[in-house]
């Protein structure tokens, strides 16, 4: 994982993952989530003021097909309620703040490669799968890194 400073300086902040792929920030922009495509894990890091990362931990255990050795995790996004949405071999896995996969949304034609929230109110989910792009209106709104940080509500257990 590379950190690129506003003036262009670059430094490696973690080289310990098998294959770092999708990444995004939490809605309040205090955590970085990184999908390791060649494992069953999505990691979280606390973002420090200088851009370094601290307190790496395995945050979500991603489910995989019985025939797969890894999750194939790719795109990662968060919604404004703090859930993390991960594109995987099984479909979209939606994870809650305490670190549990709440649901897996299967796709009609295989592995999901990426996803994003769009539309006027960021309440349309778009995902790519094979040679298709799917869209669906959802009851949540996506969080975006270019907007002001959003403090999600307390997680429910």
Please state what every model-predicted region is:
Residues 3-6, 91-120, 125, 138-141:
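Flexible "stalk/tail and boundary" regions
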Residues 24-56:
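Glycine- and Gly-Pro-enriched alpha-helical subdomains that act as flexible
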Residues 37, 47, 89, 120, ...:
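Short loop/turn segments immediately following the C-termini of beta-strands
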Residues 1, 10-31, 62-89, 109-124, ...:
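Beta-rich, blade/repeat-based domains predominating
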Residues 1, 40-42, 92-93, 133-135:
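Structural signal for beta-propeller blades
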Residues 6, 28, 38, 80-81, ...:
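Short loop/turn segments that connect beta-strands within the blades of beta-propeller domains
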Residues 45-53, 137-147:
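Short loop/turn segments immediately following beta-strands, especially the blade-tip
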Residues 2-19, 46-68, 94-107:
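Blade-edge beta-strand/turn elements of extracellular beta-propeller
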């Amino acid at each position: 994982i590379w950190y690129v400073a506003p003036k262009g300086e670059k430094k490696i902040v973690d080289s310990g993952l098998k294959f770092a792929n999708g990444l995004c920030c939490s809605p309040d922009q205090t955590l970085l989530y990184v999908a390791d495509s060649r494992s069953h894990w999505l990691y979280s890091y606390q973002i420090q003021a200088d851009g370094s990362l601290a307190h790496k931990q395995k945050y979500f255990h991603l489910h995989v097909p019985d025939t797969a050795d890894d999750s194939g995790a790719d795109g990662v996004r968060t919604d404004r309620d703090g859930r993390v949405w991960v594109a995987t071999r099984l479909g979209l896995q939606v994870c809650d703040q305490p670190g549990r996969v709440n649901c897996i949304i299967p796709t009609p034609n295989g592995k999901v490669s990426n996803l994003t929230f769009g539309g006027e109110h960021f309440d349309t989910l778009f995902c790519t799968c094979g040679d298709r792009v799917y869209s669906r209106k959802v009851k949540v709104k996506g969080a975006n890194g270019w907007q002001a940080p959003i403090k999600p509500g307390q997680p429910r257990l």
